[in-house]
């Protein structure tokens, strides 16, 4: 169930009335759900823009439409319109399930490594256009990775591996003893920092 405060309803109603489109409502959806970069998106929704499988929440003078694929991720979400200490007003959306749930310690070593790579490491690498994929996790706890995007061929990949990826995996995943790079960096087409420049 999604909770919407009366203040948020009044705020939405003011915005909808300003648009002056008959039947306009507000659509709520989850963007990149289940990942560290997950976010909630609110936008105006005219009747002609609706897909037809949205969940409807009657807010009195307008309808909040929830994208059907987002319902599970937005369950227990709270929407409020609050006044900050500075006097400014802000719309707040709290969606506790949108980023998914961290794997428990009973998850396998491979599952825990993959979860940390996908939800903590890759969002950081994405700022440089990079990414990393788990190729293998040995029974002894050695993780073999393959870098891609801006990390493929990057002159700073050794620093990224040791001070970023390996450090994070060893701190966050009990059982990881080492991290190795399986990437052929000589074939990188668009490195973030050229290996020649970094030398």
Swiss-Prot record:
GO MF: 4 iron, 4 sulfur cluster binding; iron ion binding
Q: Which residues bind [4Fe-4S] cluster?
A: 151, 154
Record Pfam families? NifU
Q: Which residues form a coiled coil?
A: none
Keyword Translocase appears in the UniProt entry:
no
Report any one BP term from Gene Ontology: protein maturation
Names of required cofactors: [4Fe-4S] cluster
- Looking at the keywords, is ATP-binding present? no
Q: State the free-text cofactor note.
A: Binds 1 [4Fe-4S] cluster per subunit. The cluster is presumably bound at the interface of two monomers.
Keyword list, A-Z:
4Fe-4S, Iron, Iron-sulfur, Metal-binding
Family of this protein: Belongs to the NfuA family.
Assembly behavior: Homodimer.
Q: What job does the chain carry out?
A: Involved in iron-sulfur cluster biogenesis. Binds a 4Fe-4S cluster, can transfer this cluster to apoproteins, and thereby intervenes in the maturation of Fe/S proteins. Could also act as a scaffold/chaperone for damaged Fe/S proteins.
What name goes with this protein? Fe/S biogenesis protein NfuA
Organism encoding this protein? Xylella fastidiosa (strain 9a5c)
Lineage here is:
Bacteria, Pseudomonadati, Pseudomonadota, Gammaproteobacteria, Lysobacterales
């Amino acid at each position: 169930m999604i909770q919407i405060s009366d203040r948020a309803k009044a705020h939405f109603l003011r915005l909808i009335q300003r648009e002056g489109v008959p039947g306009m409502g507000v659509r709520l959806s989850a963007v990149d759900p289940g990942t560290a970069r997950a976010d909630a998106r609110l936008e105006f929704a005219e009747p002609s823009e609706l897909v037809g499988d949205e969940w409807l929440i009657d807010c009195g003078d307008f309808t909040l439409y929830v994208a059907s694929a987002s319902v599970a991720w937005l369950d227990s979400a709270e929407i409020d319109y609050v006044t900050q200490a500075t006097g400014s007003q802000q719309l707040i959306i709290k969606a506790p399930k949108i980023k998914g749930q961290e794997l428990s310690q009973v998850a396998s070593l491979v599952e825990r490594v993959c979860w940390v790579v996908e939800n903590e490491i890759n969002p950081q690498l994405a700022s440089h256009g990079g990414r990393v994929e788990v190729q293998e996790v040995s029974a002894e706890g050695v993780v073999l990775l393959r870098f891609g995007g801006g990390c493929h061929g990057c002159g700073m990949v050794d620093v990224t591996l040791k001070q970023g990826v390996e450090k994070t995996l060893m701190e966050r995943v009990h059982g990881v003893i080492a991290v190795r790079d399986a990437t052929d960096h000589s074939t990188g087409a668009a490195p973030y920092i050229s290996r020649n420049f970094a030398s």
